[in-house]
Amino acid sequence: MHQKTFYYRHLLSPLITLALVTITLAGSLSGQSLVVYPAPQGSPGNDDFTVKVRRPGEPWQDLYSYGVKVDQVIEARHTPQNSSMAYFDFSGTVDVEVTWNKGDLHAVRIRPLSYDIQPVIKGNTIRFSLSQPRNLSIEVNGEIFHNLQLFASPVETDRPSANDPHTIYYGPGMHEAGTVIVPGGTTVYIAGGAMVDGQFLISHVENVRIIGRGILYQSGKRPATAQPPTAQAATSPTPGGKTGNSNRHDDLLVEFSKNVEINGIIVLPVTYTVLMGNSQQVTIRNLKSFSAGGNNDGIDVFCSRDVLIDNVFMRNSDDNIAIYGHRWGYYGNTANITVSNSTLWADVAHPVLIGTHGDPPHPDTLEDLKFINIDILDQSEAQINYQGCLSINVGDANLARNIRFENIRVEDIRLGQLVNLRVMYNRKYNTAPGGGIENVWFKNLSYEGSHANLSVIAGYDSSRSIRNLTFEALTINGRLIWDKMPGKPGWYETADFAHMFVGEHVEGLRFIRSSPEQSEPEKK
């Protein structure tokens, strides 16, 4: 199917619908449910692993192991690798069995390590149990590119009817959707066992949901450099005379919209997974994403407010989560963004990046940003200017303030920095230096590893500085870092023990053990 923009509905096969419902309801009386989804014919597979699940004491059920591309950078070039992914839904308790099919199994780890999942190993097979939803990486013999990503999601509770006139429904199977403009008041449902080749444009509308358990991808039949059909609303001036950005190939574009939910699907993008601009009241929950090419970001937020990103798994070949001011046709401040309960894996660039883009003639403020309960599995970025698992790099006269990082666990990254806070002037992206960074609080930030480079904290000049920066209960390889820590000579800077360089124009930096008198940054 060539480039088309249209609305339509796919009917779910009645037999598959019945099978899914039967699997789900069979355990409802006992509070135990297990839903597995047959893969559509023609879906890409990977035979590195054999994966099975069961309710305790019942027969094993096979999971299809999909092939997904992840990015290994070799000599500064993107080199996609064939990784594995499987998914299912459950409630109660489930047993998982994974067999490695590519030789002897010498060692295995299941990440995030904070979950402390200790499998039973017998030969080339491992077993473990889950009692709550988890997004996992199962790595045999230290292999991080040919690993298994296993997504154990909660059972769906709000699956819409295929006959609902306000639903665009993709049942199990392969679908070539093209570019779909989603009307306001519409639910797009991608069922488990579905693979949808296309992109969804949510532009100048309200009350839209894109939900399900299936896979959204773009096959490459349409060249990435070509311009897709332009959403009508996106090319019309807004009341402020601005236009959007619908001439891209992001799988999910949310712009100038309100009350949008993205929930449960898996995305294999060709550019950004989600591009969000000038939108508000947006919730992204239980989204999973893999990418392996240049500029294949995860979720990028421009000039938006009241956004919740929760329980996502992002493994991308560029920034996992990026929060910006002005770029392209998006203008205005960014505020009240929360990222929580998530797993981030940056094969290139940053797990978290704040700042960079803005509007120097009309400076933007990025404020009230929260990052809570996050596992960072990796950063691998050879360019020093783009290192930092947690980065606030303000340019273009941006002011970033009132930012909180809490309960962030960083595992042993391959190449990068723990934090990078700079008021900067990056001539590749900026036309002016940043405005400043104020009131940033890191609480319970931990790093376990030996490969992180020196972190950097630096202002630009006396009027473009970093002010009021607190690290509370910072731990490096289990050691608590604070201003009065035992064994620190008085003439040493505390930052020396945190492997941080603190440059000029940084005021109010402190490392504390706990803070009973104040638990978050003071707001202006």
Predicted segment positions?
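Bacterial N-terminal signal peptides
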Residues: S13-A26
